[in-house]
Amino acid sequence: MKKITILFLNVIFVNLLFSNSFKLHLLFTNNIHGAIHEVPARFINPEFSPILAGGAGAFTYASKLRKEAKLKEDFVMLTDAGNIFQGSQLGTYDGGSNIIKWMNWMAYDAIVPGVRDFDQGANNLSKLASEANFPFIASNLEGVDGIEDYKIINANGVKIGLIGLITPFISEGLLPEYYEGVAVSDIMKTLGTQIEKIRDEVDLIFVLSHLG
């Protein structure tokens, strides 16, 4: 049986050194809540808050890192762990489509939906998945069209499996009609099933989760 390294994506920036001496840069976002505009960082200094550069700044950083990585024959993987649009007027007025446009511009590799991504219903979540140039992955989520179990990425010859998992508590804080027909299966049982499904196809497995 093939031995697989399994890692949970729970850090912001990580570099991993593989045996063939290239770096895998993991870029990770979470709880964007539609805030891709410039916003004051009141958590740093409530009286004299520096301005966070927002989506444009994130694009500049990711583009710079990808350019540098390409020159060194390294690889950049960009993922998100959900709650992408609810929380700002920019995000909510069109159900998150503007945020998906930005994420397409950023060239995300995959995202796992969060609880707040159901705020305009499961059909809206399916619509967002159809608008994205990258997969929405949540292997334990049932009843939502367009959601995939996993994604396999070829990173300079190293095959990486991304398995998505979502919290079973999606009903908390949501109107019942927003998750009607939706079910979430057991996290660990589903994870074991997905690992067995892809372990012979990949060298590394990352778990991209929204479990908080």
What function would you assign to each model-found segment?
Residues 4-14:
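Sec-dependent N-terminal signal peptides
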Residues 19-212:
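Acidic, metal/ion-coordinating pockets
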